[in-house]
Amino acid sequence: VEVEDWAGRTGISECVSFATNWYLPETIGEDYAVVRDSIAPVVLGERYLHPSEVSASLATFPGLAKYPMAKAAVEPAIWDLYGKIVGQPLSKMIGGSNAEKILGGAVVGIAPVEDVRAAVNSLVAQGYTRVKMKIEPETALECVAAVRADHPDLTLMLDANQSFDESYLDVLCKLDALNPACIEEPYNPNYVPNSGERNLFVRLSLLQDELKTMVCLDESVVTASDMEAAMGLDNLRCYALKIAKFGGIQPTLDFYHWMRSLGKTVWMGGMFDTGVSKRMHAAFATLPGMDLPPDVSDYSAYFAHDTALPPLELKHGELVLNAPKNPVGLGCILDKEYLQPTAIDEVKVTTEG
């Protein structure tokens, strides 16, 4: 998504929803229509003095509440534009540090143990100091134990994608002993344990009582009522932040400050996204208390070609936030020479309709 002001200055963002609603009840097809027919006309009809005002104006339209990822396809572009107007990088605009670089964090998918070891070894050799491993009940212990033996000091995060349940408590306790930084979304929300407890957040709270490792919440929190239920359990203290999921930069920033005020741990997760979205998350990693490196890795982890220039590349596990040629805003521009021949559709929405 690209926005343009009266002076021809532009800002960019990215919609990261999926083709199906497996992650959130929102799809790329729906979001395309919502951005075109609803969000773009609303934004064009408003006057903003600061990009923090955009999410508040969109919140006045109740029909948009169920489309946070669509809103996050537009709102960050206005932050990028504003950064170019005032001459500031996104990290500075949101209250982050003056850091020129951040540490990245890579993700390794589920695979045979030797393949996982090889992947982690390669990432460590590239300079990554934090790796998140996707895990499943049957192979988790073997894979994580092997990686921990190879790299005793590596910051290791585990993402179960809701694949475990209470019958695997022994496995989870053994994983806990391997000292991961957190275990993300361990429990299947549809499983009913012998105790009869059906509420997922209560179940996760009971699990947290058994582990020293933090249980981290992500896809289990979809609605405001989900958040209320989770926040009612004090020992659930770790949350993955994703800008698209919260509806843009300002809502994510608001949530970050709220969690910090409550003493919770927050860190920047990631999506199946290009360098445009990854740079937003990288900027948040400069905020106070963001002690875990974010899910920001080289664009080549997912794509043969990035959608932006300069392409998002990490060297020695580090990302330069704003290179000298792109010192403001997100720090990148769309690679239109690459995008134009690969585009399926292109729509321009203007104040003239």
What are these regions (language model features)?
Residues 1, 8, 39, 74, ...:
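Conserved, mostly hydrophobic/aromatic
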Residues 4-85:
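Metal- or metallocofactor-binding catalytic centers and their adjacent structured scaffolds
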Residues 33-40, 75, 79-80, 145, ...:
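Predominant activation on well-ordered alpha-helical scaffold segments within soluble catalytic domains
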Residues 82-83, 208, 259, 285:
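A generic structural signal for well-ordered alpha-helical segments
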Residues 85-109, 143, 152:
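N-terminal small/glycine-rich loop or linker at the start of catalytic domains
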Residues 123-131:
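Catalytic domains of carbohydrate-active enzymes, especially glycoside hydrolases
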Residues 133, 138-277, 306-307, 314:
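Catalytic core of soluble alpha/beta enzymes
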Residues 272-353:
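Flexible C-terminal active-site loop/helix
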